[in-house]
Amino acid sequence: MDTKTFKRTLQHSENYNRKGFGHQAEVATQLQSEYQSSLIQEIRDRNYTLQRGDVTIRLAQAFGFCWGVERAVAMAYETRKHFPTERIWITNEIIHNPSVNQRMQEMQVGFIPVEAGNKDFSVVGNNDVVILPAFGASVQEMQLLSEKGCKIVDTTCPWVSKVWNTVEKHKKGDHTSIIHGKYKHEETIATSSFAGKYLIVLNLKEAQYVADYILHGGNREEFLQKFAKACSAGFDPDRDLERVGIANQTTMLKGETEQIGKLFEHTMLQKYGPVELNQHFQSFNTICDATQERQDAMLELVQENLDLMIVIGGFNSSNTTQLQQISQERGLPSYHIDVVERIKSINSIEHRQLNGELVTTENWLPAGKIVVGVTSGASTPDKVVEDVIEKIFALKATAAVF
């Protein structure tokens, strides 16, 4: 399929909207009431520091809702206001945050049901409205919805669309897109659908395996088994790695994406030489500014003298996981939670580990005076961050009384 032509045709359709419906001011007031926080603004105004009793909170200087997330959530609210009685669906979670997705359900925005791992779009009628989330949707899903004739509201983050444009350039130049990402992640699924030939690598270790194969060859069957769920149909490592281009899931670690890009540039330079490098390697900057800012702020925060770190965000939020990884690599006691209810007591907190396991840690909050670092993922409302900070203040205040 010519995905570029399809996209252009869809965007000119009368059933397609990606600019909103003119209710921005009204919706902005509602979003401020539901998601923003006067406490968080106070901490910002105090140089990202607030001390109360035995607790000093140090907030990362970039955290929480990014512009793309704010835009997606606002467009979803606008859609309900513009279509007060129509059935509205969304193809995935609007963003990776449980409280926001719960709010979508309260607004009668339905999630496309999933049967045996596949979405059942038969529930969508031609008079319905379907929202595409901030991560985007695959070409196949968009085509199916277009054929149904339903109204499509596209909240895809422009940074994600930029990556789609990049893999289309790879395809035009007959380059295989090497995508740094998680093959199960909605964004990477969408991105790969715009690519021609593609291979998804999770980390630098997998990228090194591919680079070694390019330079020295290897066991083809082992390669295909290793990337069975992470490559395009009919992928042949002996044929499809002669010309490569780099792209990424926008929420991955910036530094690792850069390392992977440099690795493949060096690999193709070594194999084909400087004269032919540009024929065999393409790279465009697709690192999201918001992701980069939050990771840079986290790297700065963990240099401080902190007693522990709280990372707040959905458990399926990739960018939040990367923030947690930065903290753990620093050796800090660090707890990734999605909602304030994960804090059970001063002695007990339920949190997600990097491997995805949900565990409970006892005696997590030290006695006496403490400095707590706090950050949140790009899909986390300030109100959720406020709830967590207030809970920590309250627990320590109660402990001080006794």
Curated annotation (Swiss-Prot):
Dimethylallyl diphosphate binds at residues 96, 185, 317-319, 379. Pathway: Isoprenoid biosynthesis; dimethylallyl diphosphate biosynthesis; dimethylallyl diphosphate from (2E)-4-hydroxy-3-methylbutenyl diphosphate: step 1/1; Isoprenoid biosynthesis; isopentenyl diphosphate biosynthesis via DXP pathway; isopentenyl diphosphate from 1-deoxy-D-xylulose 5-phosphate: step 6/6. Keywords: 4Fe-4S, Iron, Iron-sulfur, Isoprene biosynthesis, Metal-binding, Oxidoreductase. GO terms for biological process: dimethylallyl diphosphate biosynthetic process; isopentenyl diphosphate biosynthetic process, methylerythritol 4-phosphate pathway; terpenoid biosynthetic process. Its EC number is 1.17.7.4. Pfam families: LYTB (PF02401). [4Fe-4S] cluster binds at residues 66, 157, 288. The active site is at residue 187. It comes from the Bacteria. Its cofactor is [4Fe-4S] cluster. Coiled coil: none annotated. (2E)-4-hydroxy-3-methylbut-2-enyl diphosphate binds at residues 96, 185, 250, 317-319, 379. It is an enzyme of class 1 (oxidoreductase). It catalyses: isopentenyl diphosphate + 2 oxidized [2Fe-2S]-[ferredoxin] + H2O = (2E)-4-hydroxy-3-methylbut-2-enyl diphosphate + 2 reduced [2Fe-2S]-[ferredoxin] + 2 H(+); dimethylallyl diphosphate + 2 oxidized [2Fe-2S]-[ferredoxin] + H2O = (2E)-4-hydroxy-3-methylbut-2-enyl diphosphate + 2 reduced [2Fe-2S]-[ferredoxin] + 2 H(+). Gene3D superfamilies: 3.40.50.11270, 4-hydroxy-3-methylbut-2-enyl diphosphate reductase, catalytic domain (3.40.1010.20). Isopentenyl diphosphate binds at residues 96, 185, 317-319, 379. Catalyzes the conversion of 1-hydroxy-2-methyl-2-(E)-butenyl 4-diphosphate (HMBPP) into a mixture of isopentenyl diphosphate (IPP) and dimethylallyl diphosphate (DMAPP). Acts in the terminal step of the DOXP/MEP pathway for isoprenoid precursor biosynthesis. Belongs to the IspH family. This is 4-hydroxy-3-methylbut-2-enyl diphosphate reductase.
